[in-house]
Amino acid sequence: YDCQWIVLDHLSIVVSDQDGILDERKAIDAIMTKLRKIVQQTGVGLFLISHLRRPQGKAHEEGGQVSLSELRGSAAIAQLSDIVIGLERNQQDDDPIIRNQTTLRVIKNRFSGLTGPACKLQYDSDTGRLTEVDDEHSFF
């Protein structure tokens, strides 16, 4: 096979399919360890989608900044990942342009250490596409 990338959307579905699992955190730890081994042994790239916990401050749907501590389930998600990217959007903004604009934030970067806002993406409801928009605060 010539598989180069795997997209796993989302981790909680994999965990919920495990028979007899009583401790979600331990199940996520075990699954993350297995996924990490697959990536290391095969060289395949893995995009893993994880849901977030409710934040202490500003809600995510109101544009709250995503952090590693908000990954739901286990610290192993962040510990075993090379890069963690969060998507942030204020779905409640009065301005439809802002409401459909997403910040792509690098939260962890094992390769270079660069973290922070990487770019802004604008959603076009006519095409269903995201397009990068100019942003002076991006590090790229």
Question: Where would I find each of the regions flagged by the language model?
Answer:
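Walker B catalytic acidic pair
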Residues: H10
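Conserved H-loop
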Residues: V44, I49-H51
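…and closely analogous acidic/polar surface helices at protein-protein or active-site interfaces
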Residues: A27-I31
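Catalytic P-loop NTPase motifs of RecA-like helicase/translocase cores
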Residues: V14-V15
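C-terminal regions of RecA-like/P-loop NTPase motor modules
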Residues: Y1-I6, D19-L22, T33-T42, R54-F140
